[in-house]
């Protein structure tokens, strides 16, 4: 191919002029930046040709004049004037220019890239690229109408593609070539006669006719994405450049994928044999339209794609078979024309793998592959593996750091961000980072309070769609997650995973302080607050603080007197669902918690834990004032009230109690109620402990054993009273003579000796005294 002749280039070919109105609309720093670029262009041309005369524009700039021209004067002189100019600079220059930074004037950068908008209402437009290391590239536009001025000083081109459309030419500078013009006659606009390559480009071009011609070039460029030509530079910086072909990328991963094309490992090669591609669909999309090449047209829908070679790829979207590379993960599976959603279930038909079946998938045809479990169809076998793994439970992608497994590779990649600490998406309000864009979108709703997902049955709103789906299972009573070992079903998959850990006895999350294990990490975080004393949840009405949010919500019901959970049998109300569940065991008699040592069963788990401390002798709760220790925390709190003298529970008779249960027992003395009845002798008692002690008379059982003298007792109180005999201590001492006594009643009798105030006993006192005496004799001789 013969080299095109070199043509001269003048400063006017690369100069950009503004009208007076446009110049007045520019800001001061924008004017200075424009002057800086024009001077840089002139200095480069002077370095190539010392005899170049100084243009009038440069003289204006040097003398401090206003470098603008009037429209009519510029038409007479043949200069280029455009009412709407797109100015494209290199990424660093461009970002400083359009974001208000004046550092561009002092940055020392000399690269610039001007491009006249091909859709704007210009008298003439050109594509000018100025790079000191590559020379100057000038490209002529496609438009050729009566308003275009005479050709530039560089002279006519020797080759043209069509009448009135200039072809490629070599300018009179080393390494400078004219950019080939794109021919597109598919979407003409009758107003100006200009054609656009894509239909959406034509729509954007039509908007240019309705815009004000005096709109500032800077505003026009700020929306350059709407009219950007294929060769224009994006605003996002591309730091990673290919050393082979010079192509730039925003991310290093994209550059590495691109470099694989130069290694020759790909099975598909372009027409020039220069690059290889790993996917067949990537191969035709690499080629840009050449001069005279028309866009390819899709047979089913008539839509045109870029190169002719991509017709086959586009038909693959419509046909049920398609090439193997398309079926393996590069093709789109959405039915554009039929409205069929990706992955939706289509009706079963015959064999969908027949060769030559060109019925359009996007026009309502089926995909070639279907899932044997649920019948879900997919045009790609690789995509089909995803729904199948949902049924088989297969998770082939394993994390190298924590051995977690995933069904999809992309889920593994997102998970790996957690190990690397990488959270590329951050919230602007609170700075919290996220590994996925969708998680950031969900988090933003926390600040905005938006809850777009509404339950159709109860009207409750949710921030996330997953929360709505989980909530709807409450209405349908759906429990899709079943344990394969015991058959129990659960609403949530996380509940099933936690349940399965119980079968294996595995507790992967353990406390570093006490060694206690948990099945959930959130439970471990809640437990750590026990050691740290942290109570982050505060009541707004009484300033009480709580470790758990659920306890705070239950506490808030006490202020409103609201008890939303009520028993269906007795009507008793509760502030929490868990308390109602515990109460229902009273009616059903269920005791699911059994002690492994004595086989005793309990209604509540806390009761079992407290009981097990009897076997171990553990007393973890210590009074900070007198160092007494207790098995139950409630007993320790009641004991602390004795030190403070506080009696929060008082009876109408004025007597106070430290426990609510003691108040209830005391009230029965006023009412005469005896709810505990012996099933053998029909005798009734006020207290449950009295009933248990009485039942020992019928059974002869004496479960409480003295370790000193091997005596047995029916009641624990009798055993404790007896153990004082073996101790040398006399806790009750007389204040007058200092004599000590084991029992307080003995001290009271002794005090009467000193006061000589022994009244004659009445009949009631005699009976009470005799009963106490018989009980002591029975305890000592049994």
Swiss-Prot record:
InterPro entries registered for this protein in UniProt: C2H2-ZF_domain-containing, KRAB, KRAB_dom_sf, Znf_C2H2_sf, Znf_C2H2_type
KRAB domain residues: 9-80
Stretch list, region Disordered: 141-164, 285-364
Cellular compartment(s): Nucleus
Single GO MF descriptor: zinc ion binding
Stored SMART domains: KRAB, ZnF_C2H2
Any one GO BP annotation for this protein: regulation of transcription by RNA polymerase II
Disulfide bonds: none
PROSITE patterns xrefs: KRAB, ZINC_FINGER_C2H2_1, ZINC_FINGER_C2H2_2
Keywords: DNA-binding, Metal-binding, Nucleus, Repeat, Transcription, Transcription regulation, Zinc, Zinc-finger
GO cellular component: nucleus
Pfam families: KRAB, zf-C2H2
Top-level taxon of origin: Eukaryota
Family: Belongs to the krueppel C2H2-type zinc-finger protein family.
Reported function: May be involved in transcriptional regulation.
Protein name as it appears in the record: Zinc finger protein 786
Organism classification: Eukaryota, Metazoa, Chordata, Craniata, Vertebrata
Name of the gene: ZNF786
């Amino acid at each position: 191919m013969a080299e095109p002749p070199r043509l001269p280039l003048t400063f006017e070919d690369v100069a950009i002029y503004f009208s007076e109105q446009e110049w007045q609309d520019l800001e001061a720093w924008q004017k200075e930046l424009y002057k800086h670029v024009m001077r840089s262009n002139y200095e480069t041309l002077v370095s190539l040709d010392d005899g170049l005369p100084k243009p009038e524009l440069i003289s204006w700039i040097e003398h401090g004049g206003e470098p603008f021209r009037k429209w009519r004067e510029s038409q007479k002189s043949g200069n280029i004037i455009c009412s709407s100019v797109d100015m494209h600079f290199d990424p660093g220059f461009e970002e400083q220019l359009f974001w208000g930074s004046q550092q561009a004037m002092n940055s020392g950068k000399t690269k610039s890239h001007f491009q006249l908008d091909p859709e704007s209402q210009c008298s003439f437009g050109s594509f000018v690229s100025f790079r000191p290391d590559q020379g100057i590239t000038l490209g002529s536009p496609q438009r050729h109408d009566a308003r275009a001025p005479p050709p530039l000083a560089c002279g006519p081109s020797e080759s043209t593609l069509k009448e009135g459309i200039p072809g490629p030419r070599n300018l009179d500078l080393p390494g400078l070539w004219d950019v080939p013009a794109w021919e597109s006659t598919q979407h003409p606009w009758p107003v100006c006669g200009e054609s656009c390559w894509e239909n959406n480009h034509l729509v954007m071009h039509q908007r240019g006719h309705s815009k004000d011609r005096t709109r500032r070039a800077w505003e026009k460029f700020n929306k350059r994405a709407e009219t950007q030509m294929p060769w224009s530079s994006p605003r996002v910086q591309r730091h990673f450049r290919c050393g082979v072909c010079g192509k730039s990328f925003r991310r290093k991963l994209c550059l590495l994928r691109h470099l694989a094309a130069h290694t020759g490992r790909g099975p598909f090669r372009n027409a020039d044999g220069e690059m290889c591609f790993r996917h067949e669909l990537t191969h035709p999309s690499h080629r840009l339209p050449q001069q005279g090449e028309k866009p390819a047209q899709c047979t089913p829908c008539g839509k045109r794609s870029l190169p002719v070679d991509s017709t086959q790829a586009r038909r693959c979207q419509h046909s049920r078979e398609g090439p193997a590379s398309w079926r393996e993960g590069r093709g789109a599976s959405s039915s554009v024309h039929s409205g069929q959603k990706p992955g939706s279930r289509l009706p079963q038909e015959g064999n969908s793998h027949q060769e030559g079946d060109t019925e359009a998938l996007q026009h309502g045809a089926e995909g070639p592959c279907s899932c044997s479990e649920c019948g879900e169809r997919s045009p790609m076998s690789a995509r089909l593996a995803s729904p199948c793994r949902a049924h088989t439970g297969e998770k082939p992608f394993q994390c190298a750091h924590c051995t977690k497994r995933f069904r999809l590779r992309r889920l593994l990649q997102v998970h790996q961000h957690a190990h690397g600490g990488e959270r590329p998406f951050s919230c602007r309000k609170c700075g919290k980072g996220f590994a996925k864009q969708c998680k950031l979108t969900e988090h933003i709703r926390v600040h905005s309070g938006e809850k777009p997902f509404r339950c159709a049955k109860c009207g409750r709103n949710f921030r996330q769609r997953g929360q709505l789906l989980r909530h709807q299972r409450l209405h349908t009573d759906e429990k899709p997650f079943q344990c394969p070992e015991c058959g129990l079903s659960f609403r949530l998959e996380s509940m099933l995973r936690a349940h399965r850990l119980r079968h294996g006895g595995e507790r992967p999350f353990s406390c570093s302080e006490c060694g206690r294990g948990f099945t959930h990490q959130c439970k471990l975080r809640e437990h750590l607050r026990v050691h740290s004393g942290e109570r982050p949840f505060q009541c707004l009405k009484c300033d009480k603080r709580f470790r758990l949010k659920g306890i705070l919500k239950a506490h808030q019901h006490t202020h409103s007197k609201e008890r939303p959970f009520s028993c269906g049998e007795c009507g008793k109300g509760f502030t929490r669902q868990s308390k109602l569940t515990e109460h229902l065991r009273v009616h059903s008699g269920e005791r699911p918690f059994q002690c492994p040592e004595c086989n005793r069963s309990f209604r509540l788990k806390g009761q079992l834990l407290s009981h097990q401390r009897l076997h171990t002798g553990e007393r973890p709760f210590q009074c900070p004032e007198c160092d007494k220790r207790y098995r139950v925390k409630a007993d320790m709190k009641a004991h602390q009230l004795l030190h403070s003298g506080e009696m929060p529970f008082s009876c109408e008779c004025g007597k106070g109690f430290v426990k609510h249960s003691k108040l209830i027992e005391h009230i029965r003395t006023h009412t005469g109620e005896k709810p505990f009845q012996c099933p053998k002798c029909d005798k009734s008692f006020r207290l449950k402990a009295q009933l248990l002690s009485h039942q020992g008379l019928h059974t002869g059982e004496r479960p409480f054993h003295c370790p000193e003298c091997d005596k047995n007792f029916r009641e624990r109180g009798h055993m404790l009273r007896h153990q004082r005999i073996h101790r040398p201590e006399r806790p009750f001492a007389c204040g007058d003579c200092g004599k000590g006594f084991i029992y307080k009643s003995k001290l009271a009798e002794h005090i009467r000796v000193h006061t000589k105030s022994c009244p004659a006993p009445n009949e009631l006192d005699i009976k009470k005294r005799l009963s106490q005496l018989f009980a002591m004799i029975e305890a000592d001789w049994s």
